[in-house]
Amino acid sequence: MSLKDRFDRFIDYFTEDEDSSLPYEKRDEPVFTSVNSSQEPALPMNQPSQSAGAKENNITRLHARQQELANQSQRATDKVIIDVRYPRKYEDATEIVDLLAGNESILIDFQYMTEVQARRCLDYLDGACHVLAGNLKKVASTMYLLTPVNVIVNVEDIRLPDEDQQGEFGFDMKRNRVR
């Protein structure tokens, strides 16, 4: 069977005849098929709609997982453990996000990072917090509390007298200056 015949049959398979009254020509040529276990199955033509459905399914599964974790921790009467992390470089943020995905609370102290690295790390953690429906609260000048969806954090706004006199950055793009 020639390549042209294969191509024509492939085209004929996907074309629709608008006039069905025309007689169909039947060829009496033998059909050769080869069976190879290494051939890949044909991909469906409506792949973009399936990928949109898959994304929607992933979001639904993520939301269901978050609700499941929230229900599990509400039922648990065990003590709550808060991990304290001192990231020293931006790459440490992925470990912190993994802890959040595991439904753990994390207290993050950025005192060992430069201001630029801390802002970048905080932006990454904030994005992950929104994706995982967590909470990110500033509890001190260089400390943030990252909690899963089922933990509620109430932080009072307490201004210590020495805090305004320090010239440190609060990582919220504003500099605390003495005036």
Swiss-Prot record:
Keywords: Cell cycle, Cell division, Cytoplasm, Septation. It is found in: Cytoplasm. The keyword Membrane does not apply. GO terms for cellular component: cytoplasm. The keyword Cell division applies. Residues 19-55 are annotated as: Disordered. Residues 33-55 have a biased composition (Polar residues). One of its GO terms (biological process) is division septum assembly. InterPro entries: Cell_div_SepF, Cell_div_SepF/SepF-rel, SepF-like_sf. Homodimer. Interacts with FtsZ. Belongs to the SepF family. Cell division protein that is part of the divisome complex and is recruited early to the Z-ring. Probably stimulates Z-ring formation, perhaps through the cross-linking of FtsZ protofilaments. Its function overlaps with FtsA. HAMAP family: SepF (MF_01197). This is Cell division protein SepF. It comes from Streptococcus pneumoniae (strain JJA). The gene is sepF.
